[in-house]
Amino acid sequence: MKNHGIKANSIKTLNLETILKAYSNGIFPMAETKFEDDVFWIEPKFRGIIPLDAFRVSKSLKRHIQKRKPIIKFNQNFETIVKGCSNRKETWINSTLYNTYSLLNKAGYAQSVEVYENNKLTGGLFGININGAFFGESMYSISPNASKIALNFLIERLSKCHYTLFDTQFISKHLISLGAIEITQESYLKLLDKAINKKVDYAFY
């Protein structure tokens, strides 16, 4: 993991002003493992984004949504979503970041998108929003396709509310299959500047 030269040692939360300033400047926090309290600031040379007009919805996912008719909610079980995302053998979400995301959620900057089927939470995602930018942090599924359903709904909502940037931080084969692309940090910062200075309709209601 490449860090930005700053290391926060054994603290329970990151300062709200500091974390928002970091995201607004193209920098984000990660931990090496969930067992360590230290947090590193990351500024990759290449960034992953999903252009909001390029998200790909497979026919099978459309059929799944039509058949199962999942219910989508925002921020009803934010901490459960973060815990679900961190409940893996290897994860970068440690206790410091968990506390930070909870703080951001209470302040209105961190959002969860939750998928319910038969009144049960089956997965979702969470991220940070600053004006016209949404920074996707992590997602997980208990039942098949739950995270894809959450992502599909979120991107539709962001598009309707005139957001211009969906940041995935890095890319993976899974994200590429959904429409993610990789751009340089220089190009990313130009998109970021426009997005965080853009007035948009609030998406998370």
Language-model features and meaning:
Residues 1-205:
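N-acyltransferase acceptor-side catalytic subdomain
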